[in-house]
Amino acid sequence: VTSYTLNEVVPLKDVVPEWVRIGFSATTGAEFAAHEVLSWSFHSELGETSASKQ
């Protein structure tokens, strides 16, 4: 069995709005394959808003 790991850090605040839904998609073309997400990690830090700076 071949195993692959994908790891990517993306600064989401630069590319998505405040509220989003995250999904996964995978394909192998014409062949059958099972894709499993065995681990998922998400971390969020709220930035300072303009109202809190006053």
From Swiss-Prot:
Gene3D superfamilies per the UniProt record, alphabetical: 2.60.120.200
Keywords: Lectin
Tree of life domain: Eukaryota
Pfam families recorded: Lectin_legB
Alphabetized GO MF terms: carbohydrate binding
SUPFAM superfamilies assigned: Concanavalin A-like lectins/glucanases
Record note on quaternary structure: Tetramer of two alpha and two beta chains.
Family (UniProt): Belongs to the leguminous lectin family.
Name assigned to this protein: Lectin alpha-1 chain
Organism: Lathyrus cicera (Flat-pod pea)
